[in-house]
Regions:
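Beta-rich carbohydrate-recognition and catalytic domains
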Residues: 1-26, 30, 34-91, 100-158, ...
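Short, conserved clusters of charged catalytic residues that mark active-site
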Residues: 245
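Electrostatic interaction modules used in gene-expression and signaling proteins
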Residues: 325-327
Length: 353
């Protein structure tokens, strides 16, 4: 398969945890981003308090000489306050991905709620990037051909495309990437992996689903009802040997949709324990603009792998986890989690210009 004509160049660390802030003592990581009505770029980091309790904060991105260099903290925008976002001994709203969905004129945040039955994907929306209104947990339509119910399984790495695409039926649709996890041993010992019919590889892979654009325009609650899901990208390269997941919202490029993703290799613990001994690296895939279910190209090697100290050592070492991409002054910058402890920035560049 054709390789991806893009590369990432590491810029540096933009945000580290504040040891004097009890909400940040266990790390800042895996941010979303959004442009505010004031023309400023805002970062939405996952901040982690003692006991692995995560919140989503907001910070203004400080730009110097055309590139992001620091942040100005502005407080918390989402906490695990809803009953389905916390359990008896756990809580969290985690790993936001934020997409400005142009046909709706809205910023859509997808995040992971760490509730009583483990991680569950959810959504919130905003018009001003300050106040976020929850739409609730994500639900997947029943598809008899899968011989399964996607709602049984934890699902992470959900992210919207920024513009409408043709759905499988040809109707204008909003496309959503998601990543189901089939192993149910965390819920009931011995249950094991239960992939749907037709899926022979039970490693977590990237799926795509759709929301009818006309329906979403009439009723925003429709955004949480994802239909017509199917797997599109399974682990293939060596750095994806354990699992793969979507990163930022896909970026429109001349070749199609550029999707940055994380690939995971090495040890994989059961359940939701930190994956010590694993390695997270950033790769890229290009999806067809006319049919994003079709892969045009993918990277055989990582675009960015853990190398510097902030990426190698932290709460979970050896992690590069891309979650946001923004254009500043004609240059594309990727924001990523570093070792589950800090936030870094890299520049995305074409390699064949």
């Amino acid at each position: 398969m054709t390789d991806v004509p893009y590369a990432l160049r590491r810029i540096g660390t933009i945000m580290t945890s504040d040891a004097n802030d009890p909400f940040e003592v266990e790390g800042v990581l895996n941010p979303g981003t959004a442009w505010g009505p004031d023309g400023e770029l805002y970062l939405y980091p996952r901040i982690v308090a003692e006991g692995n309790v995560s919140r989503i904060a907001r910070a203004r991105v400080v730009v110097d000489d055309g590139q992001p260099v620091a942040v100005e903290r502005l407080g918390v925008v989402l906490s695990p306050d809803e009953g389905w976002e916390y359990g008896a001994s756990n809580a969290g709203v985690e790993d936001p991905r934020i997409t400005f969905v142009a046909p709706l004129g809205l910023h859509v945040m997808t995040y992971v709620a760490y509730g009583p039955l483990g991680p569950k994907s959810a959504m919130a929306v905003s018009t001003d990037t300050v106040t976020w209104r929850r739409l609730g947990p994500v639900r997947f339509a029943y598809q008899p051909e899968l011989d399964s119910d996607l709602n049984l399984f934890p699902n992470k790495d959900i992210v919207f495309f920024p513009d409408a695409v043709p759905g499988p039926d040809g109707r204008p649709s909003l496309a959503v990437l998601h990543r189901p996890m089939w192993d149910l041993d965390w819920l009931r010992d011995g249950e094991g992996a239960r992939p749907p019919a037709g899926i022979d590889d039970d490693r977590p892979s990237i799926w795509i689903g759709y929301i009818d654009l006309e329906a979403a325009t009439r009723d925003l609650s429709t955004l949480t009802h994802i239909e017509k899901s199917e797997m599109i990208v399974a682990p293939e390269a060596w750095y994806e040997s354990a699992k793969i997941g979507a990163g930022p919202s896909p970026l429109r490029v001349p070749e199609g949709w550029l999707l940055l993703h994380h690939g995971v290799s090495g040890a994989q613990p059961k359940g939701f324990e930190l994956a010590h001994g694993s390695k997270y690296a950033a790769g890229a895939i290009i999806l067809d603009a006319a049919d994003p279910r079709r892969i045009i190209a993918r990277s055989s090697e990582p675009l960015l792998a853990p190398e510097v100290a902030e990426e190698v050592s932290g709460t979970l070492g050896n992690v590069v986890f891309p979650t946001a991409i923004e254009t500043i002054g004609g240059r594309d910058f990727v924001f990523y989690g570093m070792a589950d402890s800090s936030i870094g920035v890299a520049e995305l560049r074409r390699t064949n210009d």
